[in-house]
Every structure is written in C-alpha cells, then in structure tokens.
C-alpha cells in the first residue's frame, strides 16, 4: 500500500500543483485612486473596489489603494438615505491596463453602472464627458421640478 501511494499519489499531487500555478494569479498594484459620482441627488461615500476603499469627492480627494487585476466589484453608499449601491456591470483590469499607470478613477453613474479610467504620470483623472452630460441633465430636471 505504501508503494502504491508513492507511485500513484506523487504524480497526481504534482499535476494538481501545476494546475494551481498555471491558473493565472492576480497581481496587485498600488495606485492613487479617486471617484466621481454623477447623480446630483446624493453624494456617494465609502466607494470600494473589491473591498478596498478608494478616494472620492468628485476627484478632489485621493487615496492610495491596492488594486488587483481581474474583475472589479464596486460598491458605494448613498448619503441621504443610507442606501448601499452595487455596480450593475463588472469592469475587468489586466496587467497591461495597469502597467505604468499612476491614477485610477471610478465613475459612478445614476443607473448604477460604473466605468474605470486610468491615467499616467502626474495627470489626475478628469470627470468623463458622458458623466458631466448626465449630471447636467439631472440638475436641469431638479431645477425644473423646484420651480413647480
């Protein structure tokens, strides 16, 4: 029985070990992060990417955060009613996406979709054109409803 274990179990154990090594582990990058919330009816708070808190304040506040490659699960809170939001989509980041990047911005849209943008060097991320247009439209709608 002891010889059987050595003959059969050794190759099986080695094969399973190699499968684990080749499955493509995640790599962690430390980037300066921020977030932009485009819904004018509330301010997002405690924005998290894979459980790691990122900066906020519509790009004004930054934080150094550990970002891993692979799927990016994003959540955030809503200040006025203490609602917890979960992103409807799941962006994916690769090593190539993150290589040489300094900043990561999470963009939170009113329909709970998210977008991630990355910048190099000392170039701070900006709000997206789409986000600013959506925000402007919602502000106009809020102003119209206040007039009634």
Per-region residue spans from a language model:
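Bacterial N-terminal signal peptides that target proteins for export
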Residues: 1-9
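C-terminal motif of bacterial Sec signal peptides marking the signal peptidase cleavage site
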Residues: 17-20
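Short coil/turn motif common to extracellular beta-sandwich-like domains
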Residues: 26-33
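Tryptophan-paired
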Residues: 42-83
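Beta-strand-rich cores of mature extracytoplasmic or soluble domains
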Residues: 82-148
